[in-house]
Structure formats: C-alpha cells, structure tokens
Amino acid sequence: MTLTKVEFTASLISKYGFDKSVAKQFVEQFFEEIRVALANGQEVKLSGFGNFSLRKKNARPGRNPKTGESVAVSARRVVVFKPGQKFRERVENVKVKS
C-alpha cells in the first residue's frame, strides 16, 4: 500500500480535526518548502526523519535498453534521501510485502 498526498491530508483531517482546505494547503506547502530549499542548493534536515540533499551526477555514456543504441546521458542533479537513525530504527523490523 502506498501513502499518497490525498491520504496524508485525510489523516490530518481525521486525527487533528483540520479543515480539509487547511490540511491540503499544509501538505502542499510542506513539500513546496522542501522543493524550494533544494532548488536553492540547501540541504533539508528533518530531525528524527532524515536529510534531503542534491548530488551532481556527471555526464556518461548510456545505452537505450530497447534498441541497444549508445546514447549520451547528460550531467544532472538528483535528489538524495538519507534516513535518520530514529527513522531507520522504526522501520527496521517492519515486514515488507514480497
């Protein structure tokens, strides 16, 4: 099962009694703050959860898996998430669906 933004918003409404529009705005703004910080080159540290950062990936040769044709993969920035210790401990013994 996947937790979506809609389900996250519904959880805020049921657990804390938020108005639907307030809960939706809160969730959207939370993720927007993370996006803006990363776009500005800042690392995002959420205590007890983990860190989001950007990593530069160099250009490299690649291959189209369908045709086998060689293609150039351009340099880019990718988002990296490193879970914090408390987060890792909480999910350590969670059973994963196979």
Swiss-Prot record:
Keywords: DNA recombination, DNA-binding, Transcription, Transcription regulation, Translation regulation. Coiled coil: none annotated. Disulfide bonds: none annotated. One of its GO terms (cellular component) is cytosol. InterPro entries: Hist_DNA-bd (IPR000119), Histone-like_DNA-bd_CS (IPR020816), IHF-like_DNA-bd_dom_sf (IPR010992), IHF_alpha (IPR005684). PANTHER family: DNA-BINDING PROTEIN HU, INTEGRATION HOST FACTOR SUBUNIT ALPHA. This is Integration host factor subunit alpha. It comes from Haemophilus ducreyi (strain 35000HP / ATCC 700724). The gene is ihfA.
